[in-house]
C-alpha cells in the first residue's frame, strides 16, 4: 500500500480528527496507522506538516532533518506531537490506500479543461474523475508515470512521476502537487478511474 499526506482546498491544518477520517474516505483511502506511517518513513517519506493518525495522535515523518521541521541537528524519525482534542485541534492527515480495483489513466483529450469539463469528460469515457488515493496507488503500486498535470476529484491538480527526469520532478519519484487552481480555468488535463 501507500501512505500519502492530505489537506483540503481550505489549506493546511484545517481538519479535526473526524474530518480527517472522512477526508481519507473521500479519497478512496483510510486514515493511516502509526505502523503504516513508520513503514512509509522507512521507505523515504519526508513531510514537514503534522497529520492525524488512526490512534488520534498527530505526527510527521522526517528523513532529512532541517530547520523548520524540528531542527537541523535532530535525528531522522517520525516526530510525535502527542494526542490532541479530536474535535477542536486541526491538522492535516495521513491516509493509506492499498486497494486498486480498476484502471487509472490520463484522458487523451484535444483541449485543456475546466474542472467541470474534466468531470464530464471522464463520465463521457465511461469512467469517473480520479481521486487522490487512486493517483497515489497507481503511482506506488503500478509505477504509473505521466508528466501531465491533471484535475482530480477534490479539485486539486497533480501528476505522478515514477521515473524522475528533467522538467518532470528531476530530484525524486513523487506525485507532484500543482495546487487547487480556480476551477474555471482551462489549463489542465484530467485523470480518470474506471472501476
Question: Where do the PLM segments sit?
Answer:
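Beta-strand cores of modular interaction/reader domains in eukaryotic scaffold and signaling proteins
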Residues: 30-31, 94-96, 128-129, 191-193
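Conserved hydrophobic ligand-interaction patch in extracellular adhesion modules
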Residues: 12, 17-44, 106-110, 115-146
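Extracellular disulfide-stabilized recognition modules
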Residues: 1-18, 48-51, 66-113, 148, ...
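Tyrosine-centered aromatic motifs in long, intrinsically disordered, low-complexity repeat arrays
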Residues: 60, 91-94, 159, 188
Amino acid at each position: 500500500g501507500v501512505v500519502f499526506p492530505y489537506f483540503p482546498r481550505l489549506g493546511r491544518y484545517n481538519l479535526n480528527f473526524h474530518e480527517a477520517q472522512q477526508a481519507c474516505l473521500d479519497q478512496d483511502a483510510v486514515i493511516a496507522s502509526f505502523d503504516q506511517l513508520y513503514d512509509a518513513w522507512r521507505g523515504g517519506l519526508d513531510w514537514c506538516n503534522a497529520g492525524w493518525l488512526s490512534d488520534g495522535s498527530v505526527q510527521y515523518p522526517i528523513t532529512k532533518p532541517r530547520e523548520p521541521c524540528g531542527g537541523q541537528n535532530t535525528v531522522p524519525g517520525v516526530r510525535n506531537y502527542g494526542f490532541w482534542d479530536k474535535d477542536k485541534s486541526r491538522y492535516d492527515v495521513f491516509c493509506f490506500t492499498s486497494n486498486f480495483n480498476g484502471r487509472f489513466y490520463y484522458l487523451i483529450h484535444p483541449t485543456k479543461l475546466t474542472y467541470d469539463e474534466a468531470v464530464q469528460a471522464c463520465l463521457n469515457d465511461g469512467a469517473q474523475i480520479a481521486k487522490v488515493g487512486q493517483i497515489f496507488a497507481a503511482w506506488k503500486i503500478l509505477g504509473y508515470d505521466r508528466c501531465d498535470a491533471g484535475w482530480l476529484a477534490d479539485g486539486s491538480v497533480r501528476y505522478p512521476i515514477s521515473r524522475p527526469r528533467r522538467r518532470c520532478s528531476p530530484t525524486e519519484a513523487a506525485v507532484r502537487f500543482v495546487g487547487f487552481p480556480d476551477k474555471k480555468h482551462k489549463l489542465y488535463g484530467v485523470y480518470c478511474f474506471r472501476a
